[in-house]
Amino acid sequence: MKRENVSRIFSKIPTLTTERFILRRISIDDSDDMYEYAQNKEVTKFLTWSPHENKGHTFEYLTYLQTRYASGEFFDWAIVCKESGKMIGTCGFTRFDYKNDCAEVGYVLNPQYHGQGIMTEVVGRVIRFGFENLALNRIECRFIEGNIASRRVMEKNGMQFEGVLRGGMLIKGEYKDIGVCAILKKDFSKKE
């Protein structure tokens, strides 16, 4: 996997689909839908970022993302319900280790849609894209200890729990323990 190939693919981010969702480029038009969950303290409790203070904050963030897409430096999709057209979260690659053909997946979902298997479905599609289109060997997800629902999404997608990085990340001024789950291409192929 080469940085240039990933940048080329994501500068014109492909649209992906699942049974219930469309995964597409995040747009400035998603501002209201994103703000709906991004301002929620419960949503950001297990994330590295703080709640958006107002709709202007969300709009500025989405404007910034457009420049990152254009330069091939942003690797997230908007999760859009096929039925309603509503954007309900994001999912994508948060970092790449190009030398070792490894990437990390991250995600966030509007809490109104929790408990419906949405992230399991969406993360599964992103994992498939990583192995089939980006030639990855390993895909991992990290979660703040205590985020049981997120770990469950990972395990339902065939990821194995590999351990905890004690004090592994400074988040909002506090060192947090970070759980790591991962799947290898060979294990994904067996699962299929």
What are these regions (language model features)?
Residues 49-50, 71, 101:
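Short, surface-exposed helix-loop/turn micro-motifs enriched in polar/charged residues
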Residues 1-45, 76, 80-192:
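Acyl-donor (CoA/ACP) binding surface of acyl/acetyltransferases
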Residues 64-78:
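A short helix-loop-beta-strand connector motif used in the catalytic cores of GNAT acetyltransferases and
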Residues 42-64:
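Conserved GNAT-fold acetyl-CoA-binding loop/helix
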